[in-house]
């Protein structure tokens, strides 16, 4: 008699199957690493998939230069401890133009430093498949995206031109110049992610845990004062509104565009308990999701993660 797999073990097995399938099927895959909790789980699953061997593909971070300092510290620590083959890419055109989220706004900053930066990196290294940690429960445009998300030669996504995925059968045939984005965590929920992190003891960025932090409220969003660059864009009146609150982050991105939530969750069990009670989206603090109706789908059509 075969024991039934638990819910998390079923998700784990599905994700490992997808990762192995892509590694076997594509010539030059890469795993995108955004340093967040989903990336941590995806990386853990990939290491399990090929243990005791090393990952058969590199890990890539598209760096906007505006991540939280704790994220950079954590990234470098993981690369050293796990012996990862890390590629980092910063859009040189964006750097030359001095693109930043304060002067140019969230939409332009995201387009140039994230979307265009990613497309540059994929073209530069000739990757034909890129793993991403997106989940269907995060946001409506991601809810309708396939596990194998096909992109044309310009990395654009056409949601009306996706292939059916029946059972666990994935069609990876692509024409020259085309590629796919692969989402092994598609069927996971935010709660699944946290329960798996707890059970597997996966290291994550400390920003996910509640602590006293300096924040300022901007348009209803609590923005953390992560370094001095933000102070250059605050008036004296704004600086006077900086307060210390006990907050944590449910999602991590560029720090001026990522809102914190007030919380008492200092441990993984606290976070899981909080997830069982919450009724709000984890991406409520992502400023880029509020650029306009359908903004995430528009970004993805142009090549965003």
Curated annotation (Swiss-Prot):
Provide the assembly information. Heterodimer composed of CysD, the smaller subunit, and CysN.
Its recorded name reads Sulfate adenylyltransferase subunit 2
Per its record, the protein catalyses:
sulfate + ATP + H(+) = adenosine 5'-phosphosulfate + diphosphate
Taxonomic lineage of the native organism: Bacteria, Pseudomonadati, Pseudomonadota, Gammaproteobacteria, Pseudomonadales
Q: Name one Pfam family in it.
A: PAPS_reduct
Protein's job: With CysN forms the ATP sulfurylase (ATPS) that catalyzes the adenylation of sulfate producing adenosine 5'-phosphosulfate (APS) and diphosphate, the first enzymatic step in sulfur assimilation pathway. APS synthesis involves the formation of a high-energy phosphoric-sulfuric acid anhydride bond driven by GTP hydrolysis by CysN coupled to ATP hydrolysis by CysD.
| Keywords from the UniProt entry | ATP-binding, Nucleotide-binding, Nucleotidyltransferase, Transferase
The Gene Ontology biological process annotation of the record reads: hydrogen sulfide biosynthetic process; sulfate assimilation
Pathway per the UniProt entry = Sulfur metabolism; hydrogen sulfide biosynthesis; sulfite from sulfate: step 1/3
Q: SUPFAM superfamilies, alphabetically?
A: Adenine nucleotide alpha hydrolases-like
The record, for NCBIfam families, names: CysD, PRK05253.1, PRK12563.1
> What would be an example GO MF term here?
ATP binding
Q: Which family does it belong to?
A: Belongs to the PAPS reductase family. CysD subfamily.
User: What are the EC numbers?
Assistant: 2.7.7.4
Write down the superkingdom of origin: Bacteria
Instruction: Look up and give the organism this protein is from.
Output: Pseudomonas fluorescens (strain SBW25)
What HAMAP family has UniProt attached to this entry? Answer: Sulf_adenylyltr_sub2
């Amino acid at each position: 008699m075969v024991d039934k797999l638990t819910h998390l073990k079923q998700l784990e097995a599905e994700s490992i199957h997808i990762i192995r399938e892509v590694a076997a099927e594509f010539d030059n895959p890469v795993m995108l690493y955004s340093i967040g909790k989903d990336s941590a789980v995806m990386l853990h699953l990939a290491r399990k998939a090929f243990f005791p061997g090393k990952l058969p593909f590199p890990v890539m971070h598209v760096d906007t230069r505006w991540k939280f300092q704790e994220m950079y510290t954590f990234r470098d620590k993981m690369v050293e401890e796990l012996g990862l083959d890390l590629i980092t890419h910063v859009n040189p055109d964006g750097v030359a133009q001095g693109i930043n989220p304060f002067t140019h706004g969230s939409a332009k900053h995201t387009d140039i430093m994230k979307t265009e930066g990613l497309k540059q990196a994929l073209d530069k290294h000739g990757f034909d498949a890129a793993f991403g940690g997106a989940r269907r429960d995060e946001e409506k445009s991601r809810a309708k995206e396939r596990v194998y998300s096909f992109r044309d030669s310009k990395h654009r996504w056409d949601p009306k031109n996706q292939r059916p995925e029946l059972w666990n059968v994935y069609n990876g045939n692509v024409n020259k110049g085309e590629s796919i984005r692969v989402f092994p965590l598609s069927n996971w929920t935010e709660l699944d992610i946290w329960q798996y992190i707890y059970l597997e003891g996966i290291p994550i960025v400390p920003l996910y845990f509640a602590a006293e932090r300096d924040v300022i409220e901007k348009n209803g969003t609590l923005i953390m004062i992560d370094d001095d660059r933000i102070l250059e864009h605050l008036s004296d009146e704004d600086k006077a509104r900086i307060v210390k609150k006990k907050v944590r982050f449910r999602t991590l991105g560029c720090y001026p565009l990522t809102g914190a939530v007030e919380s008492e969750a200092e441990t993984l069990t606290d976070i899981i308990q909080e997830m069982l009670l919450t009724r709000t989206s984890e991406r409520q603090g992502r400023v880029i999701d509020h650029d306009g109706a359908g903004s995430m789908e528009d970004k993805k059509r142009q090549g965003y993660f």
